[in-house]
A protein has these predicted regions:
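One-carbon transfer enzymes
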Residues: 1-135
């Protein structure tokens, strides 16, 4: 069975879609074992808890340095040993150490063409509004 760690920052609609797809057997032989949120107020945490999924909250601003945050996130993922890390609306940059340490095991769900519509402010409906505005 494929072990998934899903990283989130907000409402968790992508997380819910993954959970539903697993429960409906659209995604087979996979299980979300861990949800990590970069925000204490992310509704995604509640979605995970409703399905009995372990959650961790690792808020970048609660660390004295970027290096300390990077280390905490890396250690959390290393302990979980996921087969796949899914960035599902995760609004924090992924540290190079994680990219190197989990090479070939990270996918990003992003709702638009990168790099044209990414970065600060490009989340949720805002991505689509910007794309439509540009034409």
């Amino acid at each position: 069975m494929l072990s998934l760690a899903v990283l989130v920052s907000g409402g968790g609609t992508n997380l819910q879609a993954i959970i539903d797809a697993i429960e409906n057997k659209f995604i087979k032989d996979a299980k979300v074992d861990l949800v990590i949120s970069s925000s204490e107020s992310a509704y995604a945490i509640e979605r995970a808890k409703k399905h009995g999924i372990k959650t961790e909250t690792i808020v970048p601003k609660s660390f004295s340095s970027k290096e300390d945050y990077d280390k905490a996130l890396f250690e959390c993922l290393s302990k979980a040993k996921p087969d796949l890390i899914v960035l599902a609306g995760f609004l924090t940059a992924i540290p190079a150490k994680i990219i190197a340490g989990f090479r070939g095991k990270i996918i990003n769900i992003h709702p638009s063409l990168i790099p044209s519509f990414c970065g600060k402010g490009y989340y949720g409906i805002h991505v689509h509004e910007a794309a439509l505005k540009r034409g």
